């Protein structure tokens, strides 16, 4: 197996290396350059997440379909000289759209023989993309932990995803369906690459010289998991049998850290690196979003919008793709391979043996997730919270997609204005991550009470949009998201609430997990998140098709946001913690009963999905 040839961080670094736990493991001390290689991918991909998925991809998809669509009643083109009216907007041309709901004519496009509203087309596309992403994450979670697959998959997802963004420059309205396919591939690559990227973090931390020094000072041995230097696979979970670790759980990299509750050096370093990575990613996204707005403004002064209303946005997606590709190249150069254990195969086996092993790993990933579900069902507080998280994560994803399309179609906002809205929400989200701990501390709120407060504020968004159905406000032409400026305060609310919900839900769930089973249960947490987020957009898309208005989706969203509140209130954190500890005792008793099937590390066998947190 060929290892990365990056030199050690210092001349004496080799002396600080911990013993390898399997043939071919790279235990070279983590260098500053390698950490920046890890940061570089976050800087690369977060731009696509915010500027692409969160802003311009929904707009581009809707506009591509619109330029190919016809009005439902007259069958006239939605866009063009023969359409009843047009409204320019910084490089795009928009057909007749309602702001007050009085015009029931809608722009539809034929998809698989069905007449679909152009806004619904975008919602359905993202719903499908999230579903494919969830299936991909679960299926490839185990495979990525072996040999050089970790870095190989990271680069593959990064390069393929960036190419999908760049290829939008060639997607003209006649082939708008191909744009939908590119979105599915791009979103899948984005989510999958972040999961693989997160899997590098424990490896970087475990090999950091400061961690090894700290363990030596504490007299802790940097030893393999077992005496043979092999890893134990995660245990099979059944009605009586649940995996657990000892009082110290293994990080999956040969280091033993204290159980949850103590601030280990690994946890402190991991948190510090992760926080900086998130911050750098968001800063890069805001920077590129500003550049995109300037580009749209400049291109609106040219003849490009006359050729196609989507061309300026497609140039923005080209910029986003180039950015993603370029910084992925930096990660390719600076990140070491850090290979996992070799795939077990029989001597002299045919080449197709490797494919059989890969298929077994994919099956194992699904089997492992299902067994974790069966264990979670026995923990009442865990299952109640996961149901609430299922609904809440779906609501968050649905609001984001609906808001962008509502701003574009119902409010007739220009592409530049939508970009500014995205920047507003992103900056507010960064502020919310810091603000909510202060609010919680000042008001002396429990974690679940803070989550409920966030949800209550989140409910303001759809309720405010529904005010436009009240005749008095409808007559005024203001209040209830009837004017473009009204959506910006709600964008601030959305950002602040999303920042709080993401951090508090994750930490609150951590209180309920049996100590030592963090990887398996966070895999279930991530699968619940990814697996639910395709439902809401699909339902909103159907409502848009039925009514011809994006605003009608607010009724469903309002109910969806409210449903988790009683469930969160029902969760007893202290009881959940005690149940988790009791389950941990069962885990400890069953630890080591089953032999390793693949020869992979215990945590890594849980799958990379556990690290998408």
Curated annotation (Swiss-Prot):
Source lineage: Eukaryota, Fungi, Dikarya, Ascomycota, Pezizomycotina
Name of this protein: Autophagy-related protein 22-2
Biased composition (Polar residues): 80-96
Stretch list, region Disordered: 1-28, 80-99, 216-257, 592-613
Disulfide bonds listed in the record: none
Ranges of biased composition (kind: Basic and acidic residues): 232-250
Membrane topology: Multi-pass membrane protein
Protein encoded by which gene: atg22-2
Alphabetically ordered keywords of this record: Amino-acid transport, Autophagy, Glycoprotein, Membrane, Transmembrane, Transmembrane helix, Transport, Vacuole
Function: Vacuolar effluxer which mediate the efflux of amino acids resulting from autophagic degradation. The release of autophagic amino acids allows the maintenance of protein synthesis and viability during nitrogen starvation.
UniProt cross-references to InterPro entries, sorted A to Z: Atg22 (IPR044738), Atg22-like (IPR024671), ATG22/LtaA_families (IPR050495), MFS_trans_sf (IPR036259)
GO biological-process terms attached to the record: amino acid transmembrane export from vacuole; autophagy
């Amino acid at each position: 197996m060929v290892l990365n040839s990056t030199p050690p961080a210092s001349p004496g670094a080799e002396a600080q290396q911990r013993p390898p736990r399997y043939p071919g493991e790279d235990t070279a001390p983590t260098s500053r350059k390698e950490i920046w290689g890890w940061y570089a991918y976050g800087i690369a991909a977060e731009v696509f997440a915010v500027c692409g998925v969160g802003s311009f991809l929904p707009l581009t998809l809707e506009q591509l379909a619109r330029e190919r669509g016809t009005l439902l009643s007259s069958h006239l083109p939605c866009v063009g000289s023969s359409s009843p009216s047009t409204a320019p907007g910084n490089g795009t041309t928009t057909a007749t759209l309602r702001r007050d709901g009085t015009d029931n004519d809608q722009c539809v496009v034929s998809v698989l023989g069905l007449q679909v509203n152009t806004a619904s087309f975008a919602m359905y596309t993202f719903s499908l993309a999230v579903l494919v992403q969830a299936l991909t994450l679960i299926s490839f979670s185990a495979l990525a932990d072996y040999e050089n697959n970790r870095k190989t998959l990271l680069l593959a997802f990064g390069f393929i995803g960036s190419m999908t963004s760049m290829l939008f420059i060639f997607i003209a309205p006649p082939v708008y369906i191909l744009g939908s396919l590119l979105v599915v591939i791009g979103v899948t690559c984005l989510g999958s690459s972040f999961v693989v990227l997160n899997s590098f973090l424990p490896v970087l931390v475990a090999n950091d010289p400061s961690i090894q020094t700290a363990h030596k000072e504490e007299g802790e041995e940097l030893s393999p998991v077992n005496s043979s230097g092999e890893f134990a696979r995660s245990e099979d979970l059944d009605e009586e049998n649940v995996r657990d670790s000892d009082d110290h759980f293994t990080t999956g990299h040969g280091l033993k850290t204290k159980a949850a509750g103590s601030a280990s050096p690994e946890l402190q370093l991991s948190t510090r690196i992760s926080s900086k990575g998130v911050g750098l990613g968001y800063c890069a996204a805001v920077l590129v979003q500003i550049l995109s707005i300037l580009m749209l403004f400049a291109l609106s002064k040219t003849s490009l919008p006359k050729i196609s209303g989507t061309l300026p946005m497609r140039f923005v997606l080209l910029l986003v793709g180039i950015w993603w590709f370029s910084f992925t190249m930096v990660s390719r150069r600076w990140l070491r391979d850090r290979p996992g254990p070799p795939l077990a195969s029989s001597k002299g086996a045919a080449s197709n043996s490797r494919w059989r092993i890969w298929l077994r790993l994919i099956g194992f990933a699904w089997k492992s997730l299902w067994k974790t579900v069966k264990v979670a069902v026995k923990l009442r507080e865990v299952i109640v919270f996961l149901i609430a998280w299922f609904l809440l994560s779906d609501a968050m994803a649905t609001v984001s997609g609906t808001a962008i399309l509502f701003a574009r179609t119902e409010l007739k906002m220009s592409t530049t204005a939508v970009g500014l809205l995205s920047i507003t929400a992103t900056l507010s989200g960064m502020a919310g991550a810091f603000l909510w701990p202060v609010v919680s501390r000042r008001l002396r709120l429990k974690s679940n009470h803070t989550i409920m407060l966030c949800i209550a504020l989140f409910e303001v968004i759809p309720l405010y949009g529904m005010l436009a159905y009240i005749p008095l406000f409808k007559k005024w032409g203001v209040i209830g998201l009837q004017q473009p400026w009204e959506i910006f305060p709600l964008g601030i609310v959305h950002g602040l609430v999303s920042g709080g919900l993401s951090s508090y839900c994750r930490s609150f769930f951590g209180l309920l997990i049996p100590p030592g089973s963090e990887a398996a249960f966070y895999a279930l947490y991530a699968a619940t998140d990814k697996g639910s987020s395709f439902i809401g957009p699909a339902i909103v898309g159907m409502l848009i098709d039925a009514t011809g208005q994006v605003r009608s989706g607010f009724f469903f969203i309002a109910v969806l946001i409210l449903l988790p509140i009683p469930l969160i209130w029902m969760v007893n954190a202290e009881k959940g913690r005690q149940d988790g500890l009791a389950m941990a005792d069962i885990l400890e008793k069953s630890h080591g009963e089953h032999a390793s099937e693949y020869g992979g590390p215990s945590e890594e066998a849980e799958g990379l999905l556990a690290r998408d947190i």
